[in-house]
Amino acid sequence: MYRTHTCGELRGTDEGKNVILSGWIERIRDLGGVKFIVLRDRYGKTQVVVNPDSPVYPIVNNISREYVIQVEGIVRKRPAEAITPEPTGEIEIVASELKILSKSELPPFYPGDDVSEEMRLKYRYLDIRNPKMMNNLILRHKLAFATREYLSNNNFLEVETPYLTKSTPEGARDFLVPSRLKKGNFYALPQSPQLFKQILMISGIDRYFQIVRCFRDEDLRADRQPEFTQIDIEMSFVHMEDVINLAENLIRYIYKAIGIELPEKFDRITYEEAMEKYGSDKPDRRYGMEMVDLTEFFKNSDFKIIKEVLERGGSVKGFKANIPMSRKIADEYSEFVKGFGLGGVLWFKLENGQITSTTAKYLENEYKAIAEKYNMNEGEVFIIAAHDNRERMNEALGALRLKVGKQYVKVSGFDALWVVDFPFLEWSEEEGRFVARHHPFTMPYIEDLEGGVELSKVRAHAYDMVINGFEVGGGSIRIHRRDIQEKVFDIIGLTKEEAKEKFGFFLDALQYGVPPHGGIAFGLDRLAAIAAGVDNIREVIAFPKTSSGTCLLTNAPSAVTQFQLDELGIALKQSQ
């Protein structure tokens, strides 16, 4: 037997027991000849005492940190002055037996050391030994376990869908897998199980879920990985409200399982409201600083920059913030919004009851009216922008609002809401056509589509759950009629031949009795990161890739042999 107890298990009530522990050596101290070993495993830490007269004392001189050892001994209570607040801080083990199970070379760092992320990912097996990292993975497990528990108790079936499937690129690039048996043909790794879960609804499995790996070959950011995990859900005979209620209850349940209480009812705002107030379709409202329309205050202004914008049919917006402001800071903010195509920002501050600004002599009356309307307090600042493209201005001010918030506003707690009534389509400059904003299987508002509404204004039966400024889940009611699905394919520029080639199997399935259905998918990585209080999802993934898609532990992706390429019928093209 390697152990009778774990390193986080023993308490004062175990005094006098003979126990066996196994684990890693966290540290060794020598106090007047008495050796103290802190032994660590996944469950915690326990102090082991080796007295000079112990038969195992000589062994202690030949062990170091991160050795794996087995210790047998008697549990005793520590002296009152030696008790620590840790769960096992009341006791220690007096060793009578000690065995070295595995030696350790001098590691490049010790678990918990402050080292670069590159080092942590290269030696991930050392990094995961850090209790903080270990606890992140335990938390992730608890979220997944609670998900299965909740959905199983609500009549959902966990059904696995294929990883090797057909390439139907709409949006991000597919990861392609060459077929050895059918040379020149390729599987794709799924970006989501979207079509399979809809086909399961057509099959009569009315409540499906899966905790599933998905793959997207895209340029990466801090919150993206080429492979990621979704909590995937689909339901038959549902309206949007049914899916939203189920999803909200699920997220409340799984967060409660790890000790986080979310609001009893999530707020709901439209996409248009989110963009107008926060400049983002995933707003973090904890920062405050709602954007407001200020056009009315400047309609008679002679200030050249604003006057020209308004003459072109543009508008003026801004937000109030309790932050320091100077010409230098204003210049920094102007440079920031220039990255979004704006010319810069205007600003004014209420100081000693007076308007302070580099443009006060031109716009003092306008600034005073704004200050009065929005009840500005001493020291508050208004940041203002003007542009003839309202979408671009919303995006720029929204990004600036986030930058200011992260710099100056201390936030805590959880802001959870739904964003609904998304545009069904968005224009792709790159492709010169409309593309589906979510995916082309989302049900549009039929009254918009058939009522002559401009295509860019057609709404979708789509909904996103946002927590603390992160989109943690997105879903929609799906198209369950073949004629509507074919019309949508036509709108996004797919010919009948292309639609048949890519989605013929699905269009065929839509002919054989399809229940109205809808669903949602949550990012488990992001849900875990928010719960753990970390910004980067790599902190809650055991073996993540870098921002360039590399696994530093295994050095994947890597070259393969010519024999492997020949078997697949693949010839590599030299890059120019």
Swiss-Prot record:
Q: What is the source species?
A: Fervidobacterium nodosum (strain ATCC 35602 / DSM 5306 / Rt17-B1)
| HAMAP family referenced in this protein's UniProt entry, alphabetically | Asp_tRNA_synth_type1
Subunit structure of this entry? Answer: Homodimer.
Compartments in which it is found? Cytoplasm
> Pfam families given for it?
GAD, tRNA-synt_2, tRNA_anti-codon
Instruction: Tell me what gene encodes this.
Output: aspS
PANTHER family from the xrefs?
ASPARTATE--TRNA LIGASE, MITOCHONDRIAL (PTHR22594:SF5), ASPARTYL/LYSYL-TRNA SYNTHETASE (PTHR22594)
Q: Where does L-aspartate bind?
A: E170, R216, H438, R478
Stored CDD domains:
AspRS_core, EcAspRS_like_N
Q: Which Gene3D superfamilies match?
A: Bira Bifunctional Protein, Domain 2, GAD-like domain, Nucleic acid-binding proteins
Tell me, what does this protein do in biology?
Catalyzes the attachment of L-aspartate to tRNA(Asp) in a two-step reaction: L-aspartate is first activated by ATP to form Asp-AMP and then transferred to the acceptor end of tRNA(Asp).
> Region Aspartate: what ranges?
194-197
Could you tell me what reaction this enzyme catalyses? tRNA(Asp) + L-aspartate + ATP = L-aspartyl-tRNA(Asp) + AMP + diphosphate
Q: Name one GO cellular component term.
A: cytoplasm
A Gene Ontology biological process noted in the UniProt record is:
aspartyl-tRNA aminoacylation
Record has Repressor as a keyword:
no
Q: What is its main location?
A: cytoplasm
Q: Where does ATP bind?
A: R216, D217, E218, Q225, E471, G523, L524, D525, R526
- MF annotations from Gene Ontology: aspartate-tRNA ligase activity; ATP binding; nucleic acid binding
Q: What is this protein called?
A: Aspartate--tRNA ligase
- Which family is annotated? Belongs to the class-II aminoacyl-tRNA synthetase family. Type 1 subfamily.
